[in-house]
Amino acid sequence: MLLLIGGLYGLYYIDYQEEHKEPVKVDVLRLEQPEFLLSEAPDDYLMEALEYYNVKHKNIVYAQAILETGHFRSKVCKEYNNLFGLYNSYKKDYYKFDHWSESVVAYLNYIQYRYKPPDDYYQFLIKIGYAEDPQYVEKLKNIVKRYG
């Protein structure tokens, strides 16, 4: 039996051999990968990743990454690949990712899935309690003005 499996890094063909009942990798077809998946520098490719993953309000989300990481210099950014300060309240620690682009996907899954357009995105962030800083939205607006 031949099985086609799609993943983040391409398509894999798996041939199940009936007599052994275990998968044997037969052939790998790699799809063209976005350049940001190969980059270790989120500041150079974050906007491309936000577009690739169809993130809404990209400029605001980009500003969040700048603010949360101190311009991509924080420990949480460098050691955990966490661009948005995503926190695991059960483990009482920040989420750790193998690659910074995984934090973009996590942002979509944990934060942005709750957003309902056409609501104001800044108000949405306040409503969900994204940050404890009462000046958080004003800081984001200033960053958006500065970086566009």
Feature map (PLM): residue ranges:
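Catalytic cores of secreted/periplasmic lytic hydrolases that degrade extracellular macromolecules
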Residues: 1-148
